[in-house]
Amino acid sequence: MSVEEKVKKIIMDQLGVSAEEVKPEASFVEDLGADSLDLTELIMAMEEEFGVEIDDDDAQKILKVKDAIDYVSNKQ
């Protein structure tokens, strides 16, 4: 499973959204209905899955699906 597929699966599991909704340009808050707690849980799930630490400044910049995929890909 690729990084992109793993990130998308985490998003689907954490936010309870379908694969069709998890597009690269989708905003976590505006398009996928995430709130601040959802975003925190999403960051924690990605940290655990990929063994990376995402600091608060970086976490605030992860606003869309593509941002999350790019961030994790660059940390691998």
From Swiss-Prot:
Post-translational modification (record): 4'-phosphopantetheine is transferred from CoA to a specific serine of apo-ACP by AcpS. This modification is essential for activity because fatty acids are bound in thioester linkage to the sulfhydryl of the prosthetic group.
Family matches, as Gene3D superfamilies: ACP-like
Pfam families linked to this entry: PP-binding (PF00550)
Top-level taxon of origin: Bacteria
A single BP term in Gene Ontology: lipid A biosynthetic process
Compartment list: Cytoplasm
PROSITE patterns membership: CARRIER, PHOSPHOPANTETHEINE
Residue positions, PTM O-(pantetheine 4'-phosphoryl)serine: 36
Pathway: Lipid metabolism; fatty acid biosynthesis
GO molecular function: acyl binding; acyl carrier activity
Location (main, coarse): cytoplasm
Family statement: Belongs to the acyl carrier protein (ACP) family.
PANTHER family in the record: ACYL CARRIER PROTEIN (PTHR20863), CARRIER DOMAIN-CONTAINING PROTEIN (PTHR20863:SF76)
Function (record text): Carrier of the growing fatty acid chain in fatty acid biosynthesis.
Protein's name in the database: Acyl carrier protein
